[in-house]
Every structure is written in C-alpha cells, then in structure tokens.
UniProtKB/Swiss-Prot annotation:
Function: Endoribonuclease that initiates mRNA decay.
Residues annotated as transmembrane: 5-25
Gene3D superfamilies linked: Hypothetical protein af1432
Subcellular locations according to the entry: Cell membrane
Name listed for the protein in its UniProt record: Ribonuclease Y
Organism of derivation: Syntrophus aciditrophicus (strain SB)
GO cellular component: plasma membrane
Hydrolase is among the record's keywords: yes
EC number(s) reported in the record: 3.1.-.-
Amino acid sequence: MLNYTVIAFIMLGLIAIGLAIGYFLKFRLSQKRLESSENLALRIIDEAKKEAETIKKEAVLQTKENLLKLKAEFEKETRERKLDLDNLERRIRSKEENLDKRIDSMSQKENAIEVREKNLLSKEMQLNEKHDKLSRMIGEQKEKLEQIADITSEEAKDFLIRSMEAAAKRDAAMLIRKIEEDAKREADKKSREIIAYAVQRYAGDYVAENTVSVVNLPNDEMKGRIIGREGRNIRAIEAATGIDLIVDDTPEAVVLSSFDPIRREVAKISLERLITDGRIHPGRIEDIVKKVRLEVDSIIKETGERVSFDVGVHDIHPELINLLGSLKYRTSYSQNVLQHSIDVAHLTGMMAAELKMNIKEAKRAGLLHDIGKAVDHKIEGTHAAIGADYAKRFGESQRIVQAIAAHHDDGRTNTLLGVLVQAADTLSAARPGARREMLETYVKRLEELENIANSFNGVDKCFAIQAGREIRILVGSEKLSDNDAMMLCKDIVKKIESELTYPGQIKVTVIRETRVSDFAK
C-alpha cells in the first residue's frame, strides 16, 4: 500500500515538473515568434517606404512627361491654326482684289453702255426722219401709180392676194401629193415586208367546205328503210334535225342538205348511227338525234378550248369558247370560219411581233374577230357588230372590242390593232383558193365597181382587175389636171366605201396620160 502511494507521489511530481518545463518552453517559443513578427513587420514597413518612394518618383516623372506632351500638342495645334488663319487671310485678300477688278470692269461697261445708248438714240432720230421722208415719198409714188394705172391701191391689193392665194393652193396641192406619195411608198414597202414575213412564216392548210353532206349506205336496200312506210322516217329525220334528206339515184348514198352546218353534222352522225343500229323508226330517230345534239355541243366546247390552247389565247369566257367552237361548222364563201380565224390569229401575232406590239393581245383579237358569224343567222346586224357586242358582254377589253367591230370598215379603224386584224383578215381571205363565190355574184360586183368609176366626169375608161380588188381609171390630160386626178381618186374611194360591200380592200388607181403624135414627111 505504501509503495503505491510513493509511486503516486512520484508520478505527480514528474507530471508537475513536465508541465513546468512545457510552460517554460512555450513561453520562450512565443517570445521568439513575437520577436520574429516584429522584425518582419519592421522589414515590411521599410520595403513599403522604399516602394512608396519609388512610386512617388515615377508619378512625378509621368506627370512631367504628360506636361511635356500636352505642351507639344498645344504648340502643334497653335501652329496649325496659325497656318489656317494665314491661308484664310490670303484668300480674303485675293477675293478683295478680284472684287476690285470686277468693280472696275463694271464701271467700264457702264460707261460703254451709256455711250452706246447715246449713239442709238441719235440713230433712232435719224431713222425716224428717214421713215417720215420715205412715207411721204411712198404716198406721192402711190398717187402717181393710181393715176397712171387707173386702179386703186385696195383693188391692186385684192388682185395680188388672189394671185398669191392661187399660187399657194397650187404649191400646197403639189406638196400634199409629194408627201402622200412618199408616205405611201414607205408604208407600202414596210407593210409588204411585214406581210411577206408573216405569210412566209405561216402557211395554213385549207380544204374547201361544202353545203351538203353525203352518207354512204351499205346497200341500196337501206334507202327503203330510211324512207320508211309512206316516208315517215324521212319526215321524222327532217323534223328532228331541220335538214333536207335527198334520196336519189346515187348508188349506196343519200345526201343531206342544209345551210346550217351544225344541223347537217347532227343529221349526218344521227343517220350513220341509225344505219349501224338497224332500228330506224320515228321514236328511235328522236332519241338518237337528242343524244347526238348533246355530243355535238360537247364537241363544239372541246374544239373551242383546243383551238384557244393551240393558238395561245387563254382566259376566254366559256360562252365565247362555245361560239368559237361552233365556227368549225360555219363557212364564208366556202372557207371554214374557224380555220380562217386561226389563220388570222397567227398572222396578226406575227405582224404584231414585227411592230413590237403585244403579241397575245393581237392573237386574241385575230382569233375572236369573226365570233359574230356563230350567231349572225339568229340576230340582226353585221357579224362585226354582233361579235363586238358579244365580246364586250363577256368581258373582253375595249381594244379587242374595237378591233372586232372595225375589222371590215376602214373608216372606223382608228387603232393599230384594228388595222392589223383587218390586214390579216384580208390576207387569209384573199389567198388563191381560200374562198369561192358564185360567178353571177362575182360578175355583178365587178360591174357595180366599174359603174361607180364611170359615173364621174372626166373618166375615159376603167377596168376592174385582180378579181375586183383593184380598179384602174384612165382620164384625159385635157380634161383633168394632176391635182384634179388626185381629188377624183379620193372621191371614187369614198363612193365605193359608201355604196359597195366587199371583203378586204379595193385599190383605186387613176392614170392621167398625155399623148403627143406627129408625122415625119
């Protein structure tokens, strides 16, 4: 027990000694650290002082440099402003010198003008004196002339005016004739080039149309079936289609006759289907005719759409499309009107291209120009007026309407588009073989043309040539002068336009010739 107590005291003593030693060591260490920190702080303060001194010196140097730089810039700017002021001063001095010179020049001119005015006033006074003297002399001479010529001055003036007026009229007539001749030559040359180019580029095919249709039969026995009991089938066909069915001695064929090609086409298709079907009686005839009529209407519409597409004319009203398609079954002097309209559209477009005009508009006017022929048998009036009315009604432009209305009337053609349509219409109709007319009508038209020319005084002979498209008139040189011949030509043209109806245009040529003959003995 005692040993443990001793050990415990010893242990406590050792611990106390260790604590004392540790405290002493810690105290000494703290003192060393404090001394080290103080030394470091002193060192930092010294370095900071040195750095502050360096910064201060640098700041002073920088400030001095900036001051020097600002001083240099100020001196430079001052020198530049001084140079500008010197230049401005020189310009001002130069302007002052110029102004002084101009003032001196103006003063000299004013002096010269004053001198000139004085001279002019002096000359004016001299001229007035001479004018008065001349007036007195003219009056004296005038009195002497009136006494010698036994005529007053007013009468002499009237005679002189009449003479000058007659001479002026002669000169004016000669000038007008020369201008017209030059214009006609140039216009004829240019129009021939354009027309020749258009015709060379477009040559449409054409087959003459007939006013009858022939339906072939498988045998002659079919004629009896077509006639029917007591002719009832023929009467039913004629009543349903509006055509004349002719059954004659022609073997294995019957003839359909009608002035209306659409009716004739309906009758032809209907009869062919009846022959193929074999059932020919009034009830069946009516059914077939109704179906065929609807099919023909559809064909007309398709034809109009196809033609407008082929020609390149779009956005046409459906009613005008139907009228255009129906022209397939119309003829004019045996020429198919639809093919004629296509020809006119192409020719008009080509001539418009040569003249730098709107090609689409020209083709449109050419294609629709004869649209009135589709309904002219139903409505009173000329086909041109009817066509223009329909075109206006269904939304065509005013230029198109005018071209349609005036394509057969020179007097109303006041637009270049109308002239082109008229020229293309004449070209298409005037081609050899394009149209045919009855000999009696042809001869009558030529006689009327020659009678109009012979009705004027001074006409010796006249000849209608080129199928009535030109008339040549011979006049005597002793009866008419050149100016009278020109006026005669214009009068004949006006009378032909007012009294005759003709396609295209008629050229009137007046020939005045002088013949001199003598005999060698």
